[in-house]
Amino acid sequence: MLLTAVLTAAEEGGFIALNPETGTTTQGETVAETVQNLKEATSLYLEEFPMNIHAHPLVTTFEVAHA
């Protein structure tokens, strides 16, 4: 099953990851560790809450004014 991983840099160092299809989140010190942690968290989630995921989210960027 191919899923989406969205990673952002954490203020305190490392990375935070989100899988938008399931809503699972995790963190790690490196990109590789963070993705591995997200795989594990998402697998555990899907064991408890099986779902058929066929559509992937549309990921885009947008700009907002910041005061």
Task: Describe each PLM feature range.
Residues A17, T25, E63-H66:
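Generic alpha-helical hydrophobic packing signal
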Residues T22-A32:
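A short, exposed loop/beta-hairpin motif centered on an aromatic-Gly-Thr core
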Residues V6-E21:
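Short aromatic-glycine-(Arg/Gly/Cys) micro-motifs in beta-strand/loop hairpins
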Residues M1-T4, A32, Q36-A67:
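Short, charged, surface-exposed hinge/linker loops at domain edges
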